[in-house]
Amino acid sequence: MELKLEGITKSYTKGKKRKNALEDFTLTLTEGVYGLLGSNGAGKSTLINIITGIIGRDSGNISFTDGNDNSFLSHLGFMPQGMDFYRNFTAKDYIKYIMALKKYSPDNADEYALTTLGKVNLRADADKKIGAFSGGMKQRLGIAQAIVG
């Protein structure tokens, strides 16, 4: 499998100023685990948000092995840095929400969510609101999110 980003550009407007977060960015990744390093404002979060479909790009192409612009989303998992979860969701509902975003079949969604939470030792807390979780529990929920995609 290969994820290819070619000529990715994304800019933001703040007041009257326009700033490029990414300009003609190109990268090819093969199967594996990767991390992004860079100074503040280098475009790391913008890049991840573009790859995962959270935000759009101004220009450029994204392809995954077969050339389909969006097929890679089902193969991609990530753990967000800020851990900004929906505090009023239960852990199980949050994982089911991520599954729905990733277009998982709703059949057996409860069972799959509970199994995934069990992998990170949160099955017993599946019906607790995320707002009541400790920092470590939120980290494990982030890992469960990455497992789902």
Which residue ranges define each predicted feature?
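A short, flexible loop at the N-terminus of ABC-type nucleotide-binding domains that lies
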Residues: 1-5, 9-24, 30
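Walker A (P-loop) phosphate-binding loop of ABC-type ATPase nucleotide-binding domains
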Residues: 39-43
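Helix-to-loop junction immediately C-terminal to a conserved catalytic motif
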Residues: 52
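Conserved ABC transporter NBD signature motif
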Residues: 56-74
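Q-loop/switch helix immediately C-terminal to the Walker
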Residues: 82, 88-101
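Conserved ABC ATPase "signature" region
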Residues: 96, 100, 108-125
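Conserved ABC ATPase signature
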Residues: 129-133
